Amino acid sequence: MSHSSHPRPEMSLTPYVIEDTGRGERSMDIYSRLLKDRIIFIGTEITDQVANVVVAQLLFLKMEDPKKDVHIYINSLGGYITSGLAIYDTMQYLGCDINTYCIGQAASMGALLLTAGTKGKRFALPNSRIMIHQPYGGVGGTSADVALQAKEILELKKRLNHIMADSTRQPLEKIAADSERDFYMSAVEAKDYGLIDEVVVPKKKTT
């Protein structure tokens, strides 16, 4: 579950919104505005920096209201394992229900965070894609270094498989076998697999 080789889009242009506060207008970036409604958006590679921001947002929402639901929207190719696990552990620590939504794609650590939401509150949009696989890791250095790195990768692999098995209710052996290669699923297939609970179908507009 290493970071993807795909180029990462730059987030240099952050939209701002104008809000009427009753004491005049106030400008804020879109992510801060979403946070007011307890919405967190993970739309990039999951790095240490991204994880630190998401963890800080989660802790802030816990302090603000420890019982009210949090909503996490995910459109990510994945990222660093330890970064994703930092977010995962914080999600489990919060105590409140966490709704997760896949929009676009949730791959690798993105898929793990998607399925880590509160059971019954894990969603995907109809055209989203979900992918699971085993952690990647290049090894190098002395023979001792290689042995230690290989051992760490195996430990992470076992830990991630256990998390996924617990979240999906799939047998551990099936998770291990399916994720030996990139294993892609549609939203409906992800529901059948147990990664999510519902496929969100937009309501048709009536005229």
From Swiss-Prot:
Keywords associated with the record: Cytoplasm, Hydrolase, Protease, Serine protease
A GO cellular component entry from the record: cytoplasm
Active site: 108, 133
Keyword Protease: yes
Subcellular localization(s) per the UniProt record: Cytoplasm
Chief place where the protein resides: cytoplasm
Similarity section: Belongs to the peptidase S14 family.
HAMAP family per the UniProt record, alphabetical: ClpP (MF_00444)
The protein's name in its UniProt record: ATP-dependent Clp protease proteolytic subunit 2
